[in-house]
Amino acid sequence: MRRSRVLGAIAGALTLLTFSLEASAQGSADSDASWRRGTARRESDQTWAFELRFGPYRPNVDDEFEGGAAPYREVFGDSKRVFFGMELDWQALRIPWVGTFGPGVGWSYTSMSSKAKLSGTNVDSAEETSLWLMPMYAAGVLRVDVLPRELSIPLVPYGKLGLGYGLWKASNELGASEQGGVTGKGHSYGLHAAVGLALQLDFLDAAATQQLDNSVGINHAYGYLEWMWSDLGGFGGGQMKIGTSTWVTGLAFEI
């Protein structure tokens, strides 16, 4: 009988210890979950993406001429000019396990100037001639942000496809240039496409990222590198070819 009472006491103690350990583990898990909820990133609604864009630009003006003629190169040379621009995208649709898709519009500007050539020669004249270009586009934009959202890999590949439209004007010191009664200004349109890779910068300072979201609503910031192709020539309709193929870099912000 005494032995039975001892065994019963030991069994009761073991049962109580088991319940205590389970309660302690559950409390620790709840505490850990609460801590994680308290420190997790809280993001505001994300609807827009805005890009600042920079890169080299050399229009394909000479591509429309045959027989080796290259009027653009003869006046402005082979060097590329720098363009700057902006893009605004509406992230209208979120595709699960892929990213965002929606329409975007972009605008950019570049200009070049040089001494005009004396007629029929390669000799510079005293007259300055210049050309400015204003390419624009509307495109569908797909940003594949599943890597940073689900796997904590801060890389976002993306693609763009749409239509481009550009204004241009050639002028000299007297105003808009004119030849054969045709004023040196006009417009061109065509296809626009781009692919790129963006690096999400949140990992550099998570606290600053949260503060930026809280204060002005910027969810994420990116640096990016993009290859852009713009065929602005009227689909072969005789417009001046002011498009180009070039790389683009800059900063992007999701808002």
Predicted feature descriptions by range:
Residues 196-255:
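Predominantly the C-terminal beta-signal and adjacent terminal strand-loop region
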Residues 84-173:
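Gram-negative (and chloroplast) outer-membrane scaffold detector with strong preference
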Residues 1-43:
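Cleavable N-terminal export/targeting peptides
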Residues 46-48, 78-84, 130-136, 155, ...:
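Residues that define the transmembrane beta-barrel architecture of outer-membrane proteins
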Residues 60-81, 108-135, 167-188, 236-241:
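Extracellular/periplasm-exposed beta-strand and loop segments of Gram-negative cell-envelope proteins
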Residues 54-60, 107-113, 142-144, 163-171, ...:
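Transmembrane beta-strands of outer-membrane beta-barrel pores
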Residues 27, 40-46, 92-101, 145-155, ...:
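Short loop/turn motifs that connect adjacent beta-strands in outer-membrane beta-barrel proteins
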Residues 25-93, 233-241, 252-254:
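Short glycine/proline- and aromatic-enriched beta-strand/turn motifs that initiate or cap beta-hairpins
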